Amino acid sequence: MSQPMTVDCPTCGAPVEWGEKSPFRPFCSDRCKLIDLGAWAAEEHKIAGAEESEDELYSGDLEPRH
């Protein structure tokens, strides 16, 4: 029988078995999952792409408010 696949937790680096026994996969725990979510919410992680400011995206689309 082959060994189960393992991955490293993206937050702490601990080995995580990829299977039903690991409900938080790819994270090792709920704590590591929430740390990662907090980093996304704080904009510490970003998806690569062109840098565009919000003003450039919507500058001509909306009427000014008075």
Swiss-Prot record:
It comes from the Bacteria. Residues 45-66 are annotated as: Disordered. One of its GO terms (molecular function) is zinc ion binding. Its cofactor is Zn(2+). InterPro entries: DNA_gyrase_inhibitor_YacG, Znf_NHR/GATA. SUPFAM superfamilies: Glucocorticoid receptor-like (DNA-binding domain). Zn(2+) binds at residues 9, 12, 28, 32. Keywords: Metal-binding, Zinc. GO terms for biological process: regulation of DNA-templated transcription. Binds 1 zinc ion. Inhibits all the catalytic activities of DNA gyrase by preventing its interaction with DNA. Acts by binding directly to the C-terminal domain of GyrB, which probably disrupts DNA binding by the gyrase. Interacts with GyrB. Belongs to the DNA gyrase inhibitor YacG family. This is DNA gyrase inhibitor YacG. The gene is yacG.
